[in-house]
Curated annotation (Swiss-Prot):
Lineage: superkingdom: Bacteria
DegV domain boundaries: 3-280
Organism whose genome encodes this protein: Clostridium acetobutylicum (strain ATCC 824 / DSM 792 / JCM 1419 / IAM 19013 / LMG 5710 / NBRC 13948 / NRRL B-527 / VKM B-1787 / 2291 / W)
Molecular function via GO: lipid binding
Pfam families for the chain: DegV (PF02645)
Protein name according to UniProt: DegV domain-containing protein CA_C3284
Protein task: May bind long-chain fatty acids, such as palmitate, and may play a role in lipid transport or fatty acid metabolism.
The keyword Nucleus is assigned to this record: no
Keyword Cell wall biogenesis/degradation on entry: no
Keywords, comma-separated and alphabetical: Lipid-binding
Sequence positions that bind hexadecanoate: S59, S91
Length: 285
């Protein structure tokens, strides 16, 4: 009997990480008027071409069928499962997973399935899933594996910078007037995820300065709490992400992971966005 991990596609983990840590993944979807895609099945390049042509799509949580399928695959062979998902304030995935679990437990009475709200997304979620997977690979119990994820959540932060405010405005994530004023004044916000919701971390005049401010915050946190792990996120700006990763490598003496941000998160932020997700050795909160 082993403990397995299930997370969702908004963790933005690349295939190397998924395979290395034996993590199960269920995908959220994006839907235009005439077609739908699981976000793992469409590249950012194709997605934004379609978005420019067809307008803002809707995002949707994984189906109950998809969730039940993965859960059954795990528990049917006697393994236990920890599910850790995107913040419940951002998606109904966490809520739907409880319905799926109840359905699976009706069929497999002895099944053990725990569900955790990460209160985050992207690699802030991914790092919690990886921490759980490491504990599982060490032979820890389901309760200990869940605790490992919860402990990582106390140590992590995600900062990201949109290239402009157009997509945030289109997606309705900030007020239209705020987006217009921001663009007129050429203000670039640094955004973060705090207690499950997106909030403004800082407002900076240029993207270059915003990136410097973001790196400086990582430096302050890791000087105080130690460096655990770090990832650079980007949307269709790999060269910029690679330069940021090189800066981080030189400054922190660690090799950051580089991960795309997929369509479900990306439709609210837009191409050109760049960010850093990281966790520390000691608790930040």
């Amino acid at each position: 009997m082993a403990v397995k991990i299930l997370t969702d596609s908004t963790s933005c983990m690349n295939n190397d990480l998924i395979n290395k840590f034996h993590i199960n993944l269920v995908s959220l979807s994006v839907s235009f008027d005439d077609e739908s895609f699981k976000e793992k099945d469409i590249s950012n390049e194709v997605f934004y071409e379609k978005m420019n042509e067809k307008g803002i799509p809707k995002s949707s949580q994984p189906s109950i069928e998809d969730l039940c399928s993965v859960m059954e695959e795990v528990v049917s062979v006697g393994d236990e499962l920890l599910c850790i998902f995107i913040s419940s304030d951002m998606s109904g995935t966490y809520s739907t997973a409880h319905i799926a679990r109840d359905m699976v437990i009706e069929k497999y009475k002895d099944a053990k399935i725990e569900i955790l709200d990460s209160r985050s997304n992207c690699m802030q979620l991914g790092f919690a899933a990886i921490s759980a997977a490491r504990a599982a690979m060490d032979g820890k119990s389901l309760e200990e594996v869940k605790l490992a994820a919860e402990e990582n959540m106390k140590k992590s932060r995600f900062l990201f910078i949109p290239d402009n405010l157009v997509y945030l405005k289109k997606g309705g994530r900030i007020g239209g007037a705020g987006a217009l004023i921001g663009n007129l004044l050429k203000i670039i916000p640094i955004l973060t995820v705090e207690d499950g919701k997106t909030s403004v971390f800082a407002k900076i005049r240029t993207k270059k300065r915003a990136v410097e401010t973001m790196v400086q915050r990582v430096l302050e946190d890791t000087d105080k709490f130690g460096m655990g792990g770090i990832a650079v996120h980007h949307i269709n700006c790999y060269d910029e992400a690679k330069r940021l990763a090189e800066t981080i490598k030189n400054k922190f003496k660690v090799d950051p992971i580089i991960c795309d941000i997929g369509p479900v998160i990306g439709l609210h932020v837009g191409p050109g966005a760049i960010g850093i997700a990281y966790y520390t050795e000691k608790n930040m909160r």
